[in-house]
């Protein structure tokens, strides 16, 4: 059968996902032949295989993502308690053993629970879902773009238990926004360390499951996140440094959030639209206003006030937030002069330089001069905006509290 044969086709080391599937199909075979009964009508091997494939389809085809789901699922629900009462925390190394113990409950409950979990996890990744509101889906997509994946342990638990927890769409949305603000600070400052995050979210889940009904879940989440969040001083310092070299992906995210904050339906641009190119995955990319190459073009040497000043700016300011923006198809801007970057058009006559309609570029269009002082000024202004946008209050969730 397809179930048995595709396990043996590949001569590569089996992943955790493959090994767990093998255990599942072996148990389904035993149950079906009647040598091992769980008291329920057994699931056929074919049906078990089909349901397993459905679960994987919900998770997408990246094996690392599939494995991450199994870890997060275990840490959110801890489906099997250890006999001596110790709590097992799922890691890459013990995953197969933990899921072996989970399978002992029988194939049917294992697959049913896992499929419910996979549906919730898919919703947490921002895939279209009936389980949550459209607004929450949009917010969850944003959280993933802010590299907030470790928060999915909590979201998985909340989406599966939305009904029993009496969690409204509105409060779920607040929690996703709290997580986004937390992860923006975390990923820009590096605090708290990545290794602490998994256990922290597992503990938040435990706290919620043991809390009195009248406690607002967003308050539990906010209080825990605030205890470990980077303060404003640290956040400012990290935002004011060579942010592009420290974390280009997060730089792209915060530039996009600054631009998105002022978008209306009429002026909407999808800054996350994908291209088919490996090198430039996004249609909109980060543009250095003062070019980042070692050979400074003549027009820029003049604009910076001479060779020495230009070299200093290259060493000290080129990768700072104030010198960065977003443009579409930026390969064609590169070393052009400031004037040309402002007014550049594509072959069909549309502005694709700084006159591209994004609010973060409007101030650039209004000036004729760009130098180190301008970079410093614009950095300070954007940092102020970001500290407000991802404030400690928004992590506390207090912005949405009555």
Residue ranges, per PLM feature:
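Solvent-exposed, flexible loop/coil residues
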Residues: 18, 23-24, 29, 147, ...
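Glycine-rich, histidine-containing beta strand-loop boundary motifs that form or position
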Residues: 15-18, 330
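Charge-dense polyanion-binding interfaces
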Residues: 22, 27-50, 305-332
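Short, small-residue-biased leader/transition segments that mark boundaries at the very start
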Residues: 2-7
């Amino acid at each position: 059968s397809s179930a048995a044969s595709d396990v043996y086709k590949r001569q590569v080391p089996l992943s955790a996902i493959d090994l767990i599937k093998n255990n599942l199909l072996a148990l389904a075979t035993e149950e079906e032949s009647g040598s091992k009964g769980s008291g329920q009508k057994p699931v056929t091997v074919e049906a078990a295989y089909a349901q397993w494939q459905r679960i994987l389809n919900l998770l997408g085809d990246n094996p690392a993502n599939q494995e991450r789901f199994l870890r997060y699922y275990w840490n959110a629900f801890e489906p099997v308690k250890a006999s001596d009462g110790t709590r097992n925390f799922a890691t890459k190394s013990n995953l197969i053993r933990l899921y072996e113990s989970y399978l002992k409950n029988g194939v049917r409950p294992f697959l049913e629970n896992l499929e419910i979990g996979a549906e919730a996890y898919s919703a947490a990744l921002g895939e279209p879902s009936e389980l949550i509101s459209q607004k929450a889906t949009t917010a969850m997509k944003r959280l993933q773009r802010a590299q907030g994946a470790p928060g999915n342990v909590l979201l998985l638990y909340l989406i599966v238990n939305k009904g029993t927890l009496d969690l409204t769409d509105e409060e779920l949305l607040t929690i996703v926004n709290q997580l986004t603000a937390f992860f923006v600070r975390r990923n820009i400052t590096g605090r708290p360390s990545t290794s602490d995050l998994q256990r922290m979210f597992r503990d938040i889940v435990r706290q919620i499951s043991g809390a009195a009904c009248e406690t607002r879940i967003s308050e539990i989440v906010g209080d825990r996140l605030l205890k470990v969040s980077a303060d404003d001083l640290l956040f400012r310092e990290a935002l004011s440094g060579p942010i592009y070299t420290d974390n280009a992906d997060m730089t792209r995210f915060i530039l996009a959030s600054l631009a998105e904050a002022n978008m209306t339906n009429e002026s909407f641009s999808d800054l996350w639209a994908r291209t088919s190119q490996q090198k430039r995955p996004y249609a909109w990319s980060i543009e250095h206003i003062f070019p980042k190459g070692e050979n400074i073009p003549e027009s820029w040497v003049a604009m910076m006030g001479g060779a020495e000043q230009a070299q200093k700016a290259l060493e000290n300011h080129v990768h700072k937030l104030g010198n960065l923006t977003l443009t579409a198809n930026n390969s064609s801007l590169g070393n052009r002069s400031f004037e040309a970057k402002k007014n550049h058009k594509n072959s069909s006559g549309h502005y694709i330089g700084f006159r591209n309609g994004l609010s973060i570029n409007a101030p650039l269009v209004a000036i004729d001069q760009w130098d180190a002082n301008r970079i410093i000024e614009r950095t300070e202004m954007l940092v102020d905006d970001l500290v407000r946008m991802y404030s400690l209050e928004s992590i506390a969730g207090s912005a949405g509290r009555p």
